[in-house]
Regions:
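Short, well-ordered coil/turn residues at beta-beta hairpins
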Residues: 6, 43-44, 65, 171-174, ...
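Rossmann-like dinucleotide-binding domain for NAD(H)/NADP(H)
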Residues: 199, 205-349
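Phosphate/diphosphate ligand-binding glycine-rich loop within oxidoreductases
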Residues: 39-112
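Glycine-rich adenosine-cofactor-binding loop
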Residues: 7, 88, 96, 115-136
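N-terminal glycine-/charge-rich "phosphate-binding" loop or analogous flexible N-terminal tail
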Residues: 1-38
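NAD(P)-binding Rossmann-fold cofactor-contacting core
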Residues: 10, 137-154
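Rossmann-like adenosine-cofactor binding region
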Residues: 49-50, 149-241
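Oxidoreductase and adenylate-handling cofactor-binding alpha/beta cores
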Residues: 96-112, 137-140, 267-276
């Protein structure tokens, strides 16, 4: 079996070698000529998997080691009989810990009060559910908005208007969809900002195009929102530098980039390929966790407080500072991202 693999997928080489011949290429450069004689692809979001790439190839299986799959032409896959899979939930806890750390920093800067604040979670799938669990442990009141789940008759959800009326923080965890009953493309637009009541903080760790960045810049300038934390950008890998300078934190699409989340995605993608071809492999092993060496201690909490411990473990300001210093290096900052383990000890936070 011959597998073409994005060379930035971590923790994969030893395991992939057990499946067959593995060829590693830059994800954005994988071409039709490269995949013509491949049996499977393991990719990330930078590889567009469609007719132009796959027609005439012998590819039977495409696995993306990511939650998102808008880079995969699923209609073509079905038409061509090519199996495909994504990795739902692989980095859910990583994104949730990013949001948690960002909220602690926002509280330390006086933008929010963690005690009793109301958080609106827009999109309550794997990631949104993990965010909900962590924030409930912090004592936050949660309002949940997820129209597809609500349409299936599930309970405990509110309309977007309730989010706009009552929330001090709104955090986005939707997929990017352009069609269907509940499209998310530019769902956060000028009309959304005009209907806000409480000058909330906006967090986008979902997909960049869920937010109309022009409207977001206007909302920041006019004070319709207090500030923003942006991890995903509308025109990635190009970052709007004016917006980057205006937000509280701006990071290079790394909320889900913990080593644990990456390894989960790698393992799930390899498992899908192995199942499809009736083979097996040994799962990758992660190195031990290390404290973040970013020198920051929150003013509002003692060094022994669990929130201080969480920030010592991972402080997103490091990633924000790196992007502000070199916004042109968006892809490099992602590709060369340092080891970051999830803090399993925060189960009690």
């Amino acid at each position: 079996m011959r597998i073409i693999i994005d060379d930035k997928i971590p923790f994969i080489r030893e395991a992939a070698a057990q499946l067959g011949e593995a060829v590693y290429l830059s994800g954005s450069d994988i071409s039709a000529a490269d995949v013509r004689d491949a049996d499977a692809l393991i990719v990330r979001t930078r590889t567009r998997c469609d007719e132009a790439l796959l027609q005439g190839s012998r590819v039977q299986m495409v696995a993306t080691a990511t939650i998102g799959y808008d880079h995969i032409d699923t209609a073509y896959m079905q038409h061509a009989g090519v199996a495909w899979t994504n990795c739902p939930g692989c980095n859910a806890d990583s994104v949730a810990q990013y949001v948690q750390s960002a909220l602690i920093l926002l509280a330390d800067a006086g933008h929010v009060d963690l005690a009793g604040m109301t958080v609106g979670i827009v999109g309550v799938g794997h990631v949104g559910s993990s965010v909900e669990r962590m924030l409930r442990r912090m004592g936050c009141r949660i309002l949940r908005h997820d129209p597809p789940r609500q349409a299936r008759g599930e309970e405990g959800f509110v309309d977007l208007e309730e989010i706009q009326k009552h929330c001090d923080v709104i955090t986005l965890h939707t997929p990017l969809t352009r069609e269907g009953a509940h499209p998310t493309f530019h769902m956060i637009d000028e009309q959304f900002f005009d209907a806000l009541h409480r000058r909330p903080v906006l967090i986008n760790a979902a997909r960049g195009e869920v937010v109309d960045e022009a409207a977001l810049k206007t909302a920041l300038k006019t004070g319709k929102i207090r500030t923003a934390v942006i991890d995903t950008w509308e025109h990635e890998p190009c970052v709007d530098r004016e917006l980057l300078s205006a937000v509280f934190l701006g990071t290079p699409h790394i909320a889900g980039y913990s080593a644990d989340g990456k390894a989960n995605g790698t393992r799930m993608a390899l498992q899908a390929v192995a199942r499809h071809f009736g083979t097996s492999f040994s799962a990758p092993v992660l190195p031990p966790a290390l404290p973040d060496d970013y020198a920051y201690y929150p003013q509002r909490y003692s060094p022994q407080h669990p929130y201080a411990e969480l920030l010592r473990h991972y402080d997103p300001r490091r990633d924000s500072d790196a992007l502000r210093a070199h916004p042109e290096d968006f892809e490099r900052l992602r590709g060369d991202y340092p080891l970051r383990r999830e803090m399993q000890a925060n189960d009690g936070i």
